[in-house]
């Protein structure tokens, strides 16, 4: 789960590619000036991340619930670092963990490692936290503090429980027992005259095992931990830039969907199909998929797009979406446009509706796939079909359908000059 320098440099190259694509497409769209400031900011962030690969100091979050001894532990670590130079490479910050709510997902985005402090068995939120940190390539050490509050048998039992928890993690996490602020020890003294006296004396701090552990884990793995943090940040930057690029592309994609929905409507109106299921092949065609894929950087050949369209149309029929779309549009026509209930009009509007819903679903999927860096060959048409079903359910409001029907009737009714010319 650790990263290396090569992985970071590859990710930085991907950021540069997306930045250049965004710049080129913005210029082509006449929006170069509008993106100049954010483009410059993103380029500066990229350079900063490139340079951060060279840092030697580790950012360590000291995490634990209230009153687990985090502050005292940090003071001891900072004091020890004055005499133990390697520990001075640890830049510590304190984070309080609420057992009920946990912490925000990005709370530890800039941390190279996490030192989790507990005074007993772990809560589920603490276990979830270290599991997520391990999965993100961050270093993790678990410090069992206040061990002086336990008798030897109970101390061993808690330690065993903690080790069992960490054994379930993808990579090993060390557990160390410490006493950062041990309770005073009661000492009884017997005087020569036979009298006794009792005093409380400070017990020795038990932190050496933690100092050794931190040097053996965090500090020994500094290059890999720095690379892992930088890689997370570079990937986050790529998603930010890709989000901006998606926004730029969305206007182009919507314009294409607007055009293709009326092309499909005109085709279905002019040549009604014998069964409504065949509307899927009219509405969801290779041109729609190829054009939208190209907008978002998923370059499919026409043959690949036709095969994909056939798959998506078949899934659409299987899910009953053609029948559903026809039913909702027929209901709207009966209520508001009864004069235009002819079969050709219904099929034309149904084709337009399906094309629009398929187009919006493809746009949504392609945007998320671009954010995730999904290659073209891994595009899931089943996932797109599921999104299409969700889109139809979300966009079944009467007002939206009335607007679509009104536009469609104006285009398809007898005498409308644009009825068939939209396919030009």
Show the residue positions of the predicted features.
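Hydrophobic alpha-helical transmembrane segments and adjacent short intramembrane/lumenal linkers
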Residues: 294, 298-336, 340-344
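Active-site helix-to-loop segments that bind/position phosphate- or nucleotide-bearing substrates
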Residues: 224-251
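Acidic, carboxylate-rich catalytic segments that either coordinate divalent cations
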Residues: 347, 359-363, 367-424
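Conserved G1/Walker A P-loop phosphate-binding module
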Residues: 1-102, 360
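Conserved Switch II/interswitch segment of TRAFAC-class P-loop GTPases
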Residues: 108-127, 140-155
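Canonical P-loop GTPase G-domain recognition
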Residues: 150-226
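Transmembrane alpha-helical segments and their cytosolic interface motifs
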Residues: 51-66, 245-284, 310-320
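Short hydrophobic membrane-inserting alpha-helices and related fusion/pore-forming segments
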Residues: 266-279, 326-351
